[in-house]
């Protein structure tokens, strides 16, 4: 019985080892209660496998480690599939919105790298995007910027998806542009 449990634990560890997590922000927040102020921590965590899957999670707990753990679990529940090109870029320009934040992304030539700041850079790197230009517009709130980036990445479509929706072949789609 104990041997079976060990195997299950090893399998879970192997499955989780492909995921990377990065903490974008840790904030100490307070709630006013009858006896005074109750302090807790809020962590914004980005989870990704650098192969086209990424998620943003928020966790709150009385200690930092618990908040990060909850944030990772929340991020894994909100995973987004990102279509990547051969040069590890995005297929087309995109604008994403989250709250008052607006993130503008454009594909870049191979060797350009990730030109973005703050939470946007973290989300793109953990999604596996290697060549992209991105700009944060509007809010500088890390959570809203991360969510806006996730919205933009979720809205990306490949050429084959667009051709399928229009009911034409991919070659005809290229000829039209």
Curated annotation (Swiss-Prot):
GO BP, sorted A to Z: translation
Pfam families, per the entry: Ribosomal_S5, Ribosomal_S5_C
Keyword tags: Ribonucleoprotein, Ribosomal protein, RNA-binding, rRNA-binding
Presence of the UniProt keyword Cytoplasm in the record: no
Gene3D superfamilies in alphabetical order: 3.30.160.20, 3.30.230.10
PROSITE patterns: RIBOSOMAL_S5 (PS00585), S5_DSRBD (PS50881)
A GO cellular-component term linked to this record: small ribosomal subunit
InterPro entries: Ribosomal_Su5_D2-typ_SF, Ribosomal_uS5, Ribosomal_uS5_bac-type, Ribosomal_uS5_C, Ribosomal_uS5_N, Ribosomal_uS5_N_CS, Ribsml_uS5_D2-typ_fold_subgr
One Gene Ontology molecular-function label: rRNA binding
Residue intervals of the S5 DRBM domain: 19-82
Top-rank lineage group of the source organism: Bacteria
Keyword Methyltransferase found: no
Family statement: Belongs to the universal ribosomal protein uS5 family.
The protein's assembly and partners: Part of the 30S ribosomal subunit. Contacts proteins S4 and S8.
Comment on protein domains: The N-terminal domain interacts with the head of the 30S subunit; the C-terminal domain interacts with the body and contacts protein S4. The interaction surface between S4 and S5 is involved in control of translational fidelity.
Function statement: With S4 and S12 plays an important role in translational accuracy.
UniProt name for this protein: Small ribosomal subunit protein uS5
Organism: Acaryochloris marina (strain MBIC 11017)
Upper taxonomic lineage: Bacteria, Bacillati, Cyanobacteriota, Cyanophyceae, Acaryochloridales
């Amino acid at each position: 019985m104990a041997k079976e449990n060990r195997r299950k634990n090893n399998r879970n560890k192997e499955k989780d080892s492909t995921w990377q997590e990065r903490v974008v922000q840790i904030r100490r927040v307070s709630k006013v209660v009858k006896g005074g102020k109750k302090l807790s921590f809020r962590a914004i965590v980005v989870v990704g496998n650098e192969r086209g899957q990424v998620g943003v999670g928020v966790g709150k707990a009385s200690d930092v480690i618990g908040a990060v753990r909850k944030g990772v679990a929340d991020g894994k529940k909100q995973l987004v599939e990102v279509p990547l090109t051969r040069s590890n870029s995005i297929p087309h320009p995109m604008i994403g919105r989250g709250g008052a934040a607006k993130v503008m992304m454009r594909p870049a030539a191979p060797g350009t790298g990730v030109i973005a700041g703050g939470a946007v850079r973290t989300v793109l790197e953990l999604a596996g995007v290697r060549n992209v230009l991105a700009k944060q517009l509007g809010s500088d709130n890390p959570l809203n910027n991360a969510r806006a980036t996730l919205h933009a990445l979720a809205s990306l479509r490949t050429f084959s998806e667009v051709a399928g929706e229009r009911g034409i072949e991919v070659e005809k789609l290229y000829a039209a542009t």
